[in-house]
């Protein structure tokens, strides 16, 4: 299981002129004083580097969601959502990236795509050791869709479902929207995350959630991922009237209902 990785060189995305637009890290201390919600966990991913996480656990037999957030968010931003998942009897495990929240290091694309494997192995072992027996879904929002698709495409035997929210299909349009001159850099899609290619390999139940008027990652991307998905059991949920940043406010009930329906139908 430890060797399950896509052999993709992401170094072209690690140029400073790309990283400055792609990642927006902030520390947890910049957020606000936190009332303790959930279980704070540090996940080792390399020499002297740990990733911060917060595990919101509802029950030993409840379904589990390993969650990778967007590029401007941190785990602490999900302190209010974690208990809501718990009310639905779902274990919710959001994790950060290097340089985000309580995490060490500096974020790069190469590190992000490698770290998600170390994170997955840690979470899988932690759940087993702590006696959590429910199914495990991987979920990614926005930039986090890259980590979720990387894991689902390489470790399909070890996951039970895939959830993508506000995910991108192609890298070049996203980079261009972020202000990166992809033509000048000579960037081609084969240099990118290959999200569409990856989802064609994934046959586990798949849920795609996307805002109708997403101004950062257009709804077309969600539709493209859905169309390319190899899963027989798949659903595309559009959140009407919402954009990239108010998808929770406008569609939280439908959003959570779709996730609850999916994960609670998974075999235990």
What is each PLM-predicted segment?
Residues 85-104:
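Conserved alpha/beta-hydrolase
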Residues 1-44:
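An N-terminal hydrophobic leader/cap segment in hydrolases
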Residues 147-198:
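Hydrolase active-site cap/lid region
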Residues 71-84, 220:
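The serine-hydrolase catalytic nucleophile loop
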Residues 242-253:
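Catalytic histidine-centered segment of alpha/beta-hydrolase-like enzymes
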Residues 202-203, 208-210, 214:
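Short beta-strand/loop motif that positions the catalytic acidic residue
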Residues 107-129, 197:
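Alpha/beta-hydrolase active-site loop
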Residues 212-217, 244-246:
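Acidic catalytic loop of the alpha/beta-hydrolase fold
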